[in-house]
């Protein structure tokens, strides 16, 4: 990310900076002053200490990026936003014509956050109607997760689906029809550290489901049912996920066109390989 784009001709503003790691890297590489905007006072304090220790020209600015007065900090600066989530990157584009920023370097992330019930396009010609669930699809993948994490996530999903299968069998009507589908709240991680029977028992107690006496062999059956359902869900997901990258590309191009319509010269591309982060799309904009 730091290597993409030309050397900045203006001071930098790091948007949603955390501890300001990116800002310090850019200040060191480009020899420019950096202001790092972050809402969390603890992160601001930690960033200021790191900048002082490294003797780098970096100012930590504790402010809310979504507040109206935050736009005043953009004037005359080039804005860098690495994985600013949802409305945090969209607000930069919406205010671009009046913010007075010299340029933008934006790698968007978590497109669904702050979108409300429906996505509001950033460019005039965009007409695709997207709801929150569709936006979430753009970031639903585990490219960077280690193999053992993927196995654990698959097992957790199978256990949850196994419980649903057991619950549906217990609560089915006399006509044999399954009950209406319903979800349940996230489960504590500790419930997933034991065995399948213990997991189902704890979840049933919380959900008010009265389970019959279940033998060890029957637990194995319901666990296998969960795995079967997981594989079925996986097949359906493969169809949906075929559109994932295209959807994300559309969202990034909407961002790029939004900046172009606000009188910026714009480029869009990638800044790293997807194995480092699947959110590797970048928009560069200069006056």
Predicted regions and their residues:
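Conserved alpha-helix/loop element of class I SAM-dependent methyltransferases that forms part
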Residues: 2-8
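Conserved class I S-adenosyl-L-methionine
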Residues: 9-16
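Conserved SAM-binding loop of SAM-dependent methyltransferases across substrates and taxa
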Residues: 20-31
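Conserved SAM-binding motif I beta-strand of class I
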Residues: 33-38
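Conserved SAM-binding loop
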Residues: 47-48
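Conserved SAM-binding strand-loop segment of SAM-dependent methyltransferases
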Residues: 55-65
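Class I S-adenosyl-L-methionine
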Residues: 66, 70-287
